[in-house]
C-alpha cells in the first residue's frame, strides 16, 4: 500500500512517521512536483492539480473539516480527480470539542454582557447593567452537521433555547429544527445569537447578507465559525454601525490573513481570531485516517465521505 502526503504548512516528517507507525504495511512518502509514481491513497490540503490528476487512487483524504478548496479546484480542473474516487474529510478528530469551547465561551461572554462592560471600562465608567434573561436568549445554529451537533450539545448544558437550520430537518433532543429556504425567516426571527457552521457550497456563499441580517431581532450577535465567504462584510459592517447587530465574533474571512486596512479590525463591536476556532489535531487525525483506510481495505462501510454534488 502506497500513501502520498501533501500539506503546505504541516510538519510533513511528523505526519509521515506517525502514519508509518499507525499503518505499518504502508509505504508513506511526501509528494513533490514530478512524483508520478503509483499511490493508493492521498492525504492532502490545497493539493496541486498534478498531484492527483491521472492517478488510480482508492481514496483521497482532505486534512481538514472542509473540502471547498478541492471542490473549487475540481470545477476548473475536472481532470484532477476521477469522479469514482471517494473523497473524505475529517468529520471531527478533536475539532468538535474545540468548537464547543469557542462557541460556549463567546455565548456566555455576550450573555453576561462582558462586551458592554469592556466598553464601559474603556471610558472608566462604573454602571451595573440589566441582566439578560436566559429564556429570551435564543441561540440559532446555521448548519446542522457534525460540528453543529456538537455545539448544540454543549450549549444545552446552559439551558438556552436552541434552534438549528439546515437543508433537511433534524431530530436533535431539545433543539427546534428548521429546514429549507422557506423556513429560514422563521428560524432567524428569534435568534439572539446566530452561530454559523454552514458548509461552503455555491448555495451558501454570501448567505449572511443584508437581507438575512434584517430578519434577526434587533441587537443580535453573530458568531462565524465556518467560512469567510458566507458573510458579505460590507453588509455586516452596516448592520453593526446601525445597531441591528450588536456584536460579531469572527474567526474566518474572505481574505486570510485579514488585510490590515480591513475596517473589521478597528470596529469596537468586532472581535477577531485568526482561523483558530478548530484546528486539525494531528494524532487524532492520523487515528481516524488509519482506521478508515483499514475499513476501506476490508470493504466495510465508512463515515466521512463527501457528497461532491452537495459540497460536504
Swiss-Prot record:
Pfam families (alphabetical): 2-Hacid_dh_C
CDD domains named in the record: GDH_like_2
InterPro entries assigned to the protein according to its UniProt record, in alphabetical order: D-isomer_DH_CS (IPR029753), D-isomer_DH_NAD-bd (IPR006140), GhrA_Enterobacterales (IPR023514), NAD(P)-bd_dom_sf (IPR036291)
Entry's Gene Ontology cellular component terms: cytosol
EC number: 1.1.1.79, 1.1.1.81
Localization, UniProt: Cytoplasm
Keyword terms, alphabetized: Cytoplasm, NAD, NADP, Oxidoreductase
Catalytic activity entry: glycolate + NADP(+) = glyoxylate + NADPH + H(+); (R)-glycerate + NAD(+) = 3-hydroxypyruvate + NADH + H(+); (R)-glycerate + NADP(+) = 3-hydroxypyruvate + NADPH + H(+)
Active-site positions on this chain: 227, 275
Enzyme class, first EC level, given as a word: oxidoreductase
GO molecular function: glyoxylate reductase (NADPH) activity; hydroxypyruvate reductase (NADH) activity; hydroxypyruvate reductase (NADPH) activity; NAD binding
Primary location: cytoplasm
Function of the molecule: Catalyzes the NADPH-dependent reduction of glyoxylate and hydroxypyruvate into glycolate and glycerate, respectively.
Family: Belongs to the D-isomer specific 2-hydroxyacid dehydrogenase family. GhrA subfamily.
NCBIfam families assigned: PRK15469.1
Protein name per UniProt: Glyoxylate/hydroxypyruvate reductase A
Originating gene: ghrA
